[in-house]
Amino acid sequence: MSTILLPKTQHLVVFQEVIRSGSIGSAAKELGLTQPAVSKIINDIEDYFGVELVVRKNTGVTLTPAGQLLLSRSESITREMKNMVNEISGMSSEAVVEVSFGFPSLIGFTFMSGMINKFKEVFPKAQVSMYEAQLSSFLPAIRDGRLDFAIGTLSAEMKLQDLHVEPLFESEFVLVASKSRTCTGTTTLESLKNEQWVLPQTNMGYYSELLTTLQRNGISIENIVKTDSVVTIYNLVLNADFLTVIPCDMTSPFGSNQFITIPVEETLPVAQYAAVWSKNYRIKKAASVLVELAKEYSSYNGCRRRQLIEVG
């Protein structure tokens, strides 16, 4: 059987750095190599494939279609190589474990501290990177291996066939306002159509479904501000009299009593939370432990559903 000579992994790393840096000169500085050495590596890769991968200009480099394909595939290859090195190194008790994951604000306000404390008991030297946002923001990073997994809300329009989905819990969401607002009894969404609203920025998941509900009740998109910042949401509600819809476990952030829930006649959607990770990469042991801890702490806290508090 003939042996196929494959490109060197280090050459792929150099190619990726050239694209990331935007020029051969900048990449050479980052890599600690000479500019001629980097140029030769790029030339060698192009000779190997027999096509031009980058267009060299005075202002830097741009990718050709073949270069775009190589960049995408090579990033997957080098990430898998890194995961393999970490996994094999992890067999040693002295190894440094790395894990990165995404999570929604609800997790940060509820069981994140307990989950991470427990994880650190198992992996005391682990390097943990956590990112807070909606699940839709994490999907590209999950698919290409930059994130080990993410927790978030699911919705019917999400295409998750290439991902493992581990259901965790359900949560009721409630309409929240500043305590300074005068409210009596139950109201309707339609009666609030002229109010200003603030919601998390996302194009799928729970808030996408909620947006449909709000618009169906006459609330215009022009009256809805979107942001990735939970702090900004609380600030606009507290100091600018905006309305928002958040999980029932987030109505008293850090013990604050500055917010109230407003009962509405309409039924707000219930959020389904799950952990998701790519089927194309074997999940790391450390990431798997975190997912199991998320399941464990979710069960401790029930399904996060509680009755609305009447305002009046």
UniProtKB/Swiss-Prot annotation:
User: Can the keyword Transcription regulation be found in this entry's annotation?
Assistant: yes
Alphabetically ordered keywords of this record: Activator, DNA-binding, Transcription, Transcription regulation
Per the record, the similarity remark reads: Belongs to the LysR transcriptional regulatory family.
What PROSITE patterns does the entry give?
HTH_LYSR (PS50931)
List the coiled-coil residues.
Answer: none
Q: Kindly list the GO CC terms recorded for this protein.
A: cytoplasm; cytosol
Q: Return the protein name.
A: HTH-type transcriptional regulator TdcA
Report the source organism: Escherichia coli (strain K12)
The free-text function statement in the UniProt record for this protein reads:
Transcriptional activator for the tdcABCDE operon.
Where in the numbering of this chain does the HTH lysR-type domain appear? 7-64
Q: DNA binding happens at which residues?
A: 24-43
Question: Pfam families from the entry?
Answer: HTH_1, LysR_substrate
Q: Pathway, according to UniProt?
A: Amino-acid degradation; L-threonine degradation via propanoate pathway [regulation]
Tell me where on the tree of life, at the top rank, the source sits. Answer: Bacteria
Q: Which GO terms describe its molecular function?
A: cis-regulatory region sequence-specific DNA binding; DNA-binding transcription factor activity; sequence-specific DNA binding
One GO BP annotation of this record: regulation of DNA-templated transcription
